[in-house]
Design a protein with these regions (language model features):
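Classical Sec-dependent N-terminal signal peptides that target proteins to the secretory pathway
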Residues: 1-20
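N-terminal leader/linker segments that initiate helical-solenoid repeat arrays
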Residues: 17-83
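Alpha-helical repeat scaffolds
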Residues: 62-72, 96-107, 129-140, 162-178, ...
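Terminal, low-structured helical/coil segments at or just beyond the last alpha-helical repeat
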Residues: 257-292
Length: 292
């Protein structure tokens, strides 16, 4: 499950050509789901993109969940909506979601997700032996494949080792075929890259490697080949990461390097969008961040 597989990956040299909207349209239309429902699914999926990381208002969460449940009622084959419901139940509500897990595993077009979803579910309810059984089944069926490399991430407890594994997966995700095989759209992959990069930036900063922290962001995010649509999907994450890196950059003592970095940081899509919005409303950034 994409939102449950929060593994957070990607390299700056990736070529993006498979958006979340395209994925939803392609997969749901193949299943014969009505276009009106597909359009509703695209809309709500976009609306809840930040709910796991940033939304804590129970009223807002409840409203989004009710919208999802209403869409699912129209066609139970809508595995995208089942997945989104599972994500909210698991991350925000803590309620048992086995009913929706059954629907998801019944209709997802990605065979490995049926096993992976059960692995995550049984781990979450404390049935480790059963969860491990699903992991072994995945290992047997998908050994030496990109799918297995992604799943391995969830069995690595040590952060440094997990980052190494994620980097390995990033290289695999350079392939458009691999992205489609594992069902990861551009927006999700970029989101993973942002989180991966945040972990690296934090690590270098805590180790006193200020210049390296900034260069990591520049290499992974500034130089990424990402469409404006992908940027917008991840706007909040990008904004927060950029603001943090801008502050870190100010601690660099080499003035020339600091200014060079600043120019690169301010050339990004998100930086330009912030400047445009701030020019219209001086309080834009405070208002935007307070909406979290």
């Amino acid at each position: 499950m994409k939102k449950l597989t929060i593994a957070f990956l990607l390299l700056s040299s990736l070529s993006f050509a498979y958006t979340r909207k395209e994925q939803i349209q392609e997969n749901l239309s193949k299943m014969g789901i009505k276009q009106a429902i597909i359009d509703e699914t695209k809309k709500i999926d976009y609306e809840i993109r930040d709910i796991v990381a940033f939304e804590n208002d129970e009223t807002v969460i409840g409203e989004k969940l009710n919208k999802l449940l209403a869409i699912l009622k129209k066609d139970e084959r809508n595995y995208i909506v089942s997945e989104d419901i599972i994500t909210i139940y698991e991350s925000k509500i803590g309620k048992d979601y086995e009913k929706y897990l059954d629907l998801f595993t019944k209709y997802t077009p990605y065979e490995y997700e049926k096993l992976f979803a059960n692995m995550v579910y049984y781990r979450g309810i404390g049935k480790k032996d059963k969860s491990d059984g699903y992991y072994k089944e995945i290992e047997k069926k998908y050994n030496n494949t990109p799918i297995m490399e992604i799943v391995k991430i969830f069995n690595i407890a040590n952060e440094d080792n997990r980052q190494i594994q994620i980097k390995k997966v990033l290289n695999l995700l350079k392939s458009e075929d691999v992205k489609r095989q594992v069902g990861m759209a551009d927006e999700e992959v970029h989101s993973m890259n942002l989180t991966y990069t945040l972990t690296e930036v934090r690590k270098y900063y805590n180790d006193g490697k200020i210049e390296k922290a900034v260069s990591e962001y520049i290499n992974n995010v500034v130089n990424a080949n990402v469409s404006n649509e992908v940027h917008e999907y991840n706007r909040l994450k990008e904004t927060l990461l950029l603001l943090n890196v801008l502050m870190i950059n100010e601690e660099i003592t080499n003035k020339k390097l600091r200014e060079q970095n600043k120019q690169k940081l301010e050339s990004t899509y998100i930086s330009k969008e912030i400047k445009k919005a701030t020019a219209k409303d001086a309080d834009y950034l405070d208002k935007y961040l307070n909406e979290m």
